[in-house]
């Protein structure tokens, strides 16, 4: 890299390069405790709906050249019939799979992936998908 004027004189033909990843698909997992919400924080169903909206739109008003075009593509929510939960979170997270579609060697868009949720979930749990 050219870092000084002396370097510039010696390395006049050197150009910088940035390595890029043309497309990346990130997965994030999180939790909301209904029991803690009721007992401690006062977190309401209205707050929960606002949280879902905030997650879905979190990059819309925060564009950055460093992050490229980041966007939340889908929110997969597991709802439990019981306040304490009907299944451990790891089983629910394991029910979500992301795979490249056949014939796609180098993904370039979200459409190059298939995101699925297992058809059978533990009793007392249902899935809601938002995009």
What are these regions (language model features)?
Residues 1-131:
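Basic polyanion-binding and macromolecular-assembly surfaces
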């Amino acid at each position: 890299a050219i870092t000084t004027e002396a370097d510039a004189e010696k390395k006049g033909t050197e150009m910088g390069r940035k390595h890029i990843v043309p497309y990346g698909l990130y997965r994030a997992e999180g939790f909301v405790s209904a029991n803690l919400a009721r007992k401690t924080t006062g977190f309401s169903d209205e707050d929960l709906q606002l949280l879902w909206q905030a997650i879905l739109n979190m990059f819309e008003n925060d564009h950055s050249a460093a992050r490229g075009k980041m966007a939340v593509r889908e929110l997969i929510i597991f709802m439990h019939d019981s306040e304490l939960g009907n299944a451990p979170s790891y089983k629910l997270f394991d029910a979500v799979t992301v795979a490249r579609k056949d014939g796609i060697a180098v993904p370039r868009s979200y459409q190059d992936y298939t995101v699925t949720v297992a058809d059978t979930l533990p009793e007392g749990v249902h899935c809601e998908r938002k995009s």
